[in-house]
């Protein structure tokens, strides 16, 4: 059932310790700004944090109040997490009577009218980013778009591909490297449900989130008023969060990069009836970028994405096709409410271990049928992952097996890899993480979702969220910066505003012509 990393591969890894030296990592963390009463902040993005359009490390996602922090790429885990913490510390110093909401599912919201679209200035690029968000609002509702998460970016070093696959350089051997990452992604789809099982932290939602929404989910109402599913792990990953029916027809199986790009480009240029009914414009004002299945590739909701840094006006899909996959973006992480920065070292080490295992383990091609079954498994884990005796579909749909059995097999498979990784580093950190998290299989009460649900029942979502938000705010406020300094942040703030002004001055096309140009480049 569980594909094993062969003893030959482990022997090779032990004999080539340099292969995994220099893994590139990065974190993107989203968080809502709230006032001290627990309501969504109604203030614009603080000017002292720089221009959201052009700042390297501090921007906004869907809403003006939805902050997004982006770490520089780092090779050391502690270094990366310290950079992330420094960004949080800096932001805490520049919030006025506001805190950062510490959970994935939103705080109390009286009305969707309180959710203001992120603003990026009058440049064509800035207006397009806001219009894209307006399209998301019109397609899926604003409430769904202010769910927060953590994205983990992961890239294996060139030395790995050189030794593992005989690659000489990134450019001439891009197809080999891309094939390796696609194998990782296929195994991630097959077994990545382990991430929401262990780290999912959104088993409940504020009642305001469900206002005017129909659902068949059998919610239980807690005494404090919030709604929850007793065995849920990540409602953020469910149909309540990032899901839509228009994308269910996209038959993306990650068997080849060309196929992946072709199917996404097809979605970007194929009209969709529901979105055509919304319309492109109303009273001369744009309602969305276009009326197609996807406005752009960013609209694809997936638990993992292949990525490549773009050049100039290049689209992300063209960049992938021309130069291959550069890194992968893990998108299945809820905000860790027990961490001031939404993620901790234990999670990063587990992700490293799991992603390396996904790369080294056999990853046969995936049929459309198997992809459907993997999605069903994810859904079961997301909605009832801690349910005793829960079974998952295995062997391409031919049989079922208890989650607990598969989970133990998975950890056994990763244990040997953890030992090999630790032998390179002269410690037992990966083995410790493997041993500790393995206990979550037999003891689901140790998972993040079980732990946070227990606290939610005790204090309510609002009470717990405010307590943690205030606690983390005070901690971050009192801690000194370690990697960055205030001068660095000041310089980046000034640079970001100058760059935004440059973009505004460089515009030569009307917004209509600019949009037509962008849409034609996505064909």
UniProtKB/Swiss-Prot annotation:
Key words, A-Z: ATP-binding, Glutathione biosynthesis, Ligase, Nucleotide-binding
Catalytic activity of the protein: L-cysteine + L-glutamate + ATP = gamma-L-glutamyl-L-cysteine + ADP + phosphate + H(+)
Any single Gene Ontology cellular-component annotation: cytosol
GO molecular function: ATP binding; glutamate-cysteine ligase activity; metal ion binding
GO BP: any one term: glutathione biosynthetic process
EC assignment: 6.3.2.2
Pathway(s) of this molecule: Sulfur metabolism; glutathione biosynthesis; glutathione from L-cysteine and L-glutamate: step 1/2
Transmembrane segments: none
Family stated for the protein in its record: Belongs to the glutamate--cysteine ligase type 1 family. Type 1 subfamily.
UniProt protein name: Glutamate--cysteine ligase
Organism: Baumannia cicadellinicola subsp. Homalodisca coagulata
High-level lineage: Bacteria, Pseudomonadati, Pseudomonadota, Gammaproteobacteria, Candidatus Palibaumannia
Encoding gene per record: gshA
């Amino acid at each position: 059932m569980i594909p094993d990393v062969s003893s030959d591969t482990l022997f090779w890894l032990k004999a080539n310790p340099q292969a995994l030296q220099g893994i590139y990592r990065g974190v993107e963390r989203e968080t809502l700004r709230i006032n001290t009463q627990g309501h969504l902040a109604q203030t614009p993005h603080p000017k002292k944090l720089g221009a959201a359009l052009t700042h390297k490390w501090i921007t906004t996602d869907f809403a003006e109040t939805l902050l997004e922090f982006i770490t520089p790429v780092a090779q050391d885990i502690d270094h990366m997490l310290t950079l992330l913490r420094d960004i949080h510390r800096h932001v805490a110093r520049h919030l006025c009577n506001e805190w950062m909401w510490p959970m994935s599912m939103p705080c109390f919201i009286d009305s969707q009218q309180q959710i203001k679209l992120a603003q990026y200035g009058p440049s064509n690029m800035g207006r397009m980013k806001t219009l894209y968000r307006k399209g998301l609002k019109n397609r899926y509702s604003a409430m769904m778009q202010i769910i927060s998460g953590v994205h983990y970016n992961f890239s294996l070093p060139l030395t790995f591909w050189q030794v593992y696959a005989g690659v000489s350089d990134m450019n001439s051997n891009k197809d080999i490297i891309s094939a390796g990452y696609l194998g990782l992604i296929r195994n991630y789809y097959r077994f990545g449900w382990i991430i929401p099982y262990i780290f999912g932290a959104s088993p409940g939602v504020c009642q305001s989130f469900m206002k005017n929404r129909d659902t068949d989910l059998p919610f239980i109402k807690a005494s404090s008023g919030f709604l929850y599913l007793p065995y849920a792990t990540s409602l953020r990953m469910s149909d309540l969060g990032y899901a839509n029916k228009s994308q269910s027809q996209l038959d993306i199986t990650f068997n080849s990069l060309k196929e992946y790009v072709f199917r996404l480009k097809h979605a970007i240029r194929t009209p969709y009836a529901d979105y055509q009914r919304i319309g492109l414009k109303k009273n001369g004002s744009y309602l969305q970028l276009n009326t197609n299945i996807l406005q752009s590739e960013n609209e694809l909701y997936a638990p993992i994405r292949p990525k490549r840094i773009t050049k100039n006006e290049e689209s992300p899909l063209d960049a992938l096709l021309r130069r291959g996959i550069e890194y992968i973006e893990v998108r299945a992480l809820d905000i860790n409410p027990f961490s001031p920065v939404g993620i901790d070292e234990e999670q990063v080490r587990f992700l490293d271990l799991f992603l390396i295992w996904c790369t080294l383990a056999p990853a046969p091609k995936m049929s459309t049928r198997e992809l459907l079954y993997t999605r069903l498994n994810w859904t079961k884990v997301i909605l009832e992952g801690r349910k005793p005796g829960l079974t998952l579909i295995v062997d391409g749909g031919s049989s079922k097996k208890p989650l607990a059995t598969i989970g133990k097999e998975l950890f056994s498979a990763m244990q040997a890899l953890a030992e090999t990784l630790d032998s390179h580093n002269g410690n037992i950190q990966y083995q410790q993480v493997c041993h500790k998290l393995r206990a979550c299989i037999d003891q689901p009460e140790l998972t993040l979702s079980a732990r946070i649900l227990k606290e939610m029942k005790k204090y309510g979502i609002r009470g717990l969220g405010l307590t943690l938000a205030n606690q983390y705010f005070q901690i971050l406020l009192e801690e000194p910066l370690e990697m960055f300094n205030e001068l660095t942040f000041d310089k980046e703030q000034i640079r970001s505003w100058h760059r935004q002004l440059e973009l505004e001055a460089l515009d030569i096309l009307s917004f209509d012509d600019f949009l037509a140009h962008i849409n034609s480049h996505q064909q």
